[in-house]
Amino acid sequence: MFNLKIISLLFILLVTACSGENAEETINNTTNENDKGEITMSEDKVYAAMPEMTIDTGKKYTAKIETSMGEMKVEFFSDTAPVTVNNFISLSNDGYYDNIIFHRVISGFMIQGGDPSGTGHGEYGKYPGYTFNDELDSQQPYEKGILAMANAGPNTNGSQFFIMYVDYPLPYQYTIFGKVTEGLDVIDAIAGVQTAEGDRPVNDVTILGVTVSSD
């Protein structure tokens, strides 16, 4: 019975993806370049390619995630998940996560966000316009406060992430790239909100902004 519960929760963490020409055309049609020829985010938060590697893996990176229910501080694991950390930091610095909601909240499991459509479907493969490979070398367990990527299967990471509300024995199929070090009470508060169909909060819980720092 316990294994069946884990399997059912694994399905919840899947990001619904879409393959085929229609999705590709949507991405191509909604991406632009600036005057310098650099890839930029379109108005509806779609990119032509994943961010270039810009972080220094020798540095310690943290972020302040300000939400409508309080503030959390996250420490990133750039040593074990450098590409994922670079992706999250790049999107954060570009304002990608600003005003995006936590679209799925499951008390006793996790809170999930990062989808501009606010559905978890990512507009069926539209957001953020690219995918990248898993980084599964972390020895961290999926415990309270862990920050990890939601996906649609192996090597399909994009912008959606989840934060563990409780310790849970998930299989290592989701890239762990950080942990909440301050503001665990905010996770508690978010996990306690009333939800409706699809585990979506009745009243939106919104990411107001993400501020990244490095030592």
Where does each model-flagged region fall?
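Cyclophilin-like peptidyl-prolyl cis-trans isomerases
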Residues: 2, 18-215
